[in-house]
């Protein structure tokens, strides 16, 4: 397959189409997603060839034309895997987490609607591809090393997602009082207030939601600040409880005008 005109991206989902084909959403390197009909993508045949089209795989394909002038769907007879995960599929919890990562990007990434959106020179949304590729690559690594922890990987992903989506909260100041936050301060990430609020300025219900065990080590705001200054693969020795992950995801959904219940894979994690 020629590399000159090939398109690369991560497979987000796939459904069988007719007898041998597959329709899949692909997150391109530029952060846009596109629907593709992969002819013969189900594999099989006389030689029982397995399909190379698996969720989370990085694939390269040649577009054989458009089915619609709006670029809502492409067709491809030529495609191959460029990178694949192995260890993730041996860990059920990690696989569910990868599916959640993928569903998030399925919902957050814009659909390609013109030729410019297919070009790698279109880089307005490139951070979305970087987010998913880094998350899956790290997930594969920790599964291989037998060091997987759901809270850590989920919290890291959600923190990086806030950055790429442009909704990262001010982690240094209380949104109600304006006080500077110290590392040891108990603060709650309030979706309604748009940032962190010190415990003494919270309603009773929100005070109950603070994870005091985790925050007694280092506040959630401080961990987010540390992650924001680090490369995805370089983040170490940072933990998140599942309660804190709920806090982060609720914040993202509120800013994106969504609800956690909109995500089918979320209930398998929390």
Model-derived features: positions:
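Non-catalytic alpha-helical scaffolds and adjoining flexible linkers that form interface surfaces
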Residues: 1-22, 27-270
């Amino acid at each position: 397959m020629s590399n000159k005109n090939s398109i690369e991206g991560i497979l987000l989902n796939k459904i069988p189409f007719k007898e041998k084909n597959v329709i899949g959403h692909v997150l391109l390197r530029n952060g846009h997603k596109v629907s593709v009909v992969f002819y013969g993508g189900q594999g099989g045949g006389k030689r029982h060839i397995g399909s190379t089209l698996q969720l989370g795989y990085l694939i390269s394909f040649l577009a054989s034309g458009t089915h619609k002038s709006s670029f809502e769907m492409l067709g491809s007879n030529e495609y191959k895997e460029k990178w694949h995960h192995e260890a993730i599929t041996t860990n059920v919890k990690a696989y569910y987490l990868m599916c959640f990562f993928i569903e998030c990007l399925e919902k957050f990434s814009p659909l390609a609607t013109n030729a410019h959106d297919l070009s790698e020179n279109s880089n307005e949304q490139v951070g979305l591809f970087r987010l998913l590729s880094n998350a899956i690559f790290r997930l594969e690594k920790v599964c291989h090393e037998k060091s997987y922890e759901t809270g850590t990987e989920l919290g890291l992903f959600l923190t990086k997602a806030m950055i790429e989506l442009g909704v990262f909260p001010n982690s240094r100041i209380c949104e109600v009082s304006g006080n500077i936050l110290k590392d040891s301060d108990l603060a709650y990430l309030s979706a309604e207030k748009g940032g962190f609020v010190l415990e003494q300025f919270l309603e009773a219900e929100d005070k109950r939601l603070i994870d005091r065990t985790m925050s007694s080590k280092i506040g959630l705001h401080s961990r987010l600040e540390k992650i924001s200054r680090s490369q995805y693969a370089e983040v170490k020795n940072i933990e998140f409880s599942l309660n804190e992950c709920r806090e982060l995801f609720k914040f993202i959904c509120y800013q994106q005008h969504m609800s956690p219940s909109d995500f089918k894979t979320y209930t398998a994690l929390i």
